């Protein structure tokens, strides 16, 4: 069953039963109590203890404390799987909050009080050569213009909601919008239909769904749905049991991620 250089993407494509086999092989404790993403990260962590491995995450920089940062591989949020990134690496490649950074990672040194993983070598920033990151523009310096490219949302003949948007409230790339509706009016279903339209009609676009102050079961439902329509789509969340500071932090990280995509000329 052993496979070298497993990545989080590799494991997320496998069934939970298959990941259990890796967990048993690496002798991971209490693996049956973990969800799929937590277990996948635990397998990668166990693999790292045997050899260097490649991992990626969303960068959060602490400018007020020396300029170092952490890669957040799990839900844009702090976790024990975070990867330390030195200030010198951040400065060398001109990295910013919200960048997706990938590279070779080393496990914590034995006997050290530091239990964090460390980035040894950066080989990709937002999926491209890291040297390209230094020459990109800054989001505040970009010129705002009116949308000039329509985003078609209709994707299912049986669904009239997205068809009505296209007819009466058309949406363009770069446009902001708001859904105003009372509770239990079907906003979640509406968002699902919009996500399906983006995934079908704008395949090169990056789909990120942000859920704030929602129930955990709503998060699970959206995660399952988004993964079924768009393998590269993301669901980022801060559920109602989290502190308000968590809601703000997650929202800011997703906004930073969106700005980095725009700087990279991605939709």
Where is each model-derived feature located?
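Phosphate-binding/switch loop-helix module in NTP-utilizing enzymes
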Residues: 246-267
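Phosphate-binding P-loop/Walker A region and its immediate neighborhood
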Residues: 105-110, 120-163
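Residue-level signature of catalytic and energy-coupling elements of molecular machines
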Residues: 19, 39, 69, 86, ...
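Phosphate-interacting basic helix/loop segments used at nucleotide- and nucleic-acid interfaces
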Residues: 53-55, 160-164, 254-259
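Phosphate-binding glycine-rich loops and their immediate beta-loop-alpha structural context
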Residues: 144-146, 150-251
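N-terminal "pre-motor" subdomain/linker immediately upstream of P-loop NTPase catalytic cores
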Residues: 32, 37-133
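Basic helix-extension-helix modules of the SAP/HeH family
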Residues: 1-51
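Conserved phosphate/pyrophosphate-binding and hydrolysis machinery centered on Walker-type P-loop NTPases
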Residues: 5, 9-13, 29-37, 111-116, ...
């Amino acid at each position: 069953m052993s496979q070298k250089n497993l990545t989080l993407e590799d494991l997320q494509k496998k069934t939970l039963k298959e990941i259990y086999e890796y967990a048993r092989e690496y002798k991971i404790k209490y693996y049956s109590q973990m969800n799929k993403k937590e277990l996948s990260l635990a397998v990668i962590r166990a693999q790292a203890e045997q050899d260097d491995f490649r991992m990626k995450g969303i960068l959060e920089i602490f400018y007020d404390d020396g300029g170092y940062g952490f890669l957040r591989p799990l839900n844009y949020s702090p976790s024990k799987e975070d990867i330390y990134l030195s200030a010198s690496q951040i400065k060398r490649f001109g990295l910013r909050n919200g960048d997706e950074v990938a590279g070779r990672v080393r496990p914590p040194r034995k006997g050290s009080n530091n239990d964090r993983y460390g980035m040894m070598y950066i080989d990709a920033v937002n999926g491209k050569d890291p040297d390209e990151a230094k020459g990109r523009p800054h989001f505040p310096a970009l010129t705002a213009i009116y949308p000039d490219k329509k985003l078609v949302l209709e994707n299912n003949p049986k669904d009239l909601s997205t068809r009505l948007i296209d007819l009466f409230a058309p949406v363009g790339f770069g446009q902001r919008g708001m859904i105003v509706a009372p509770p239990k009016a079907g906003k979640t279903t509406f968002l699902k239909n919009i996500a399906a339209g983006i995934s079908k009609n704008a395949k090169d676009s990056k789909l990120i769904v942000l859920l704030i102050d929602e129930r955990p079961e709503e998060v699970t439902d959206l995660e399952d749905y988004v993964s079924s329509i768009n393998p590269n789509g993301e669901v980022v969340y801060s559920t109602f049991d989290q502190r308000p500071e968590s809601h703000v932090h997650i929202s800011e990280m997703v906004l930073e991620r969106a700005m980095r995509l725009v700087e990279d000329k991605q939709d």
